[in-house]
């Protein structure tokens, strides 16, 4: 569930209908509003409160401050968080103009200061983060233990999309997709299916 104005009760009904994932928590997601003077929680609160929801988190150091990353970690725990880049074409590229979505009908976005912006320069348009940046932010800024941040980037997403029988861990019989990095989380080697690419 995500890109949603759902109220809390709708989000709970979504669980009953089989929803298990909240897409990029805090981004394009309903939260507390006032209705006739009463506070009404939204999808955000349902995703944090209900264990049935795993949550995707764009931990790029831009979408969410370290304090919110810590709050998510405290409320969901390591096993219910999946780090996602939400990256678009400008990921890993220099500042400039890129298209979000279709090459023929995509939305023009501007990449600067480590984030993709809508033309108004205010709203974010996805992310330009890479996976190593997310691990770095979670460990260095939010203080999450490295092994837990790596689980959030590997086994947790694999489990949520139903491919944990082949991806997400290092073990006999698993796909040998590996990234080796140093203490600064700078990538040193990349292996896909056991073959070194970098």
Feature-to-residue mapping (PLM):
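Histidine/acidic-residue-rich, glycine-tolerant segments that coordinate divalent metal ions
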Residues: 1-40, 92
């Amino acid at each position: 569930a995500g890109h949603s104005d759902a109220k809390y009760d709708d989000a709970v009904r979504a669980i009953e209908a089989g929803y298990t994932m909240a897409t990029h928590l805090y981004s394009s997601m309903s939260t507390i509003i006032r209705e006739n003077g009463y506070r009404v929680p939204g999808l955000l609160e349902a995703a944090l409160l209900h264990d049935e929801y795993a949550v995707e988190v764009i931990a790029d150091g831009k979408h969410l401050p370290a304090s919110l990353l810590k709050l998510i970690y405290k409320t969901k725990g390591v096993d219910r968080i999946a780090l996602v880049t939400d990256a678009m074409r400008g990921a890993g590229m220099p500042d400039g103009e890129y298209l979000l979505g279709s090459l023929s009908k995509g939305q023009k976005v501007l990449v600067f200061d480590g984030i993709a912006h809508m033309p108004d320069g205010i709203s974010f348009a996805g992310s330009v983060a890479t996976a190593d940046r997310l691990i770095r932010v979670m460990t260095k800024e939010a203080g999450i233990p490295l092994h837990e941040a790596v689980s959030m980037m590997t086994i947790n997403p694999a489990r949520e999309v139903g491919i944990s029988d082949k991806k997400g861990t290092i073990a006999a019989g698993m796909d040998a997709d590996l990234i080796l990095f140093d203490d600064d989380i700078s990538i040193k080697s990349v292996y896909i299916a056991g073959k070194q690419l970098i």
